[in-house]
Amino acid sequence: LMNKLKDYYDVAYDLICMHEFVLSLEKLKREHAVSAMDIAKGCLDYGIHPPTMYFPLIVSEALMLEPTETESKESLDQAAQIFIKLYETALNDPEKLHNAPTNCYITRPNEVEAARNPILTYQFEND
């Protein structure tokens, strides 16, 4: 997966890895205003779980991809194609990623509002 993506994204540590690797989207953010969060939220529109965002902290705009050892080659190839599509979208239509996800029940929440005013319990409707 890392080898398929390194022609598109900057790999933070281009070394042999076991199953996880880190991408840095610093250049993508600087040149196209697309952040690691934008790409992660875009994953949701393609039905894949987003990678870990902003970790490790020493990598700017980090995305940590950690496919499990049980993933098939086909599913890894499909994930690579999705990340390549997201990269191309970042170059050609960054606003689409700024609004992602659009195909989910809950679209992009206001992260600052959610952090400042968390709702920690669900309020059931009265019957």
Regions inferred by a protein language model and the residue ranges of each:
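Non-catalytic terminal extensions of PLP-dependent enzymes
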Residues: 1-127
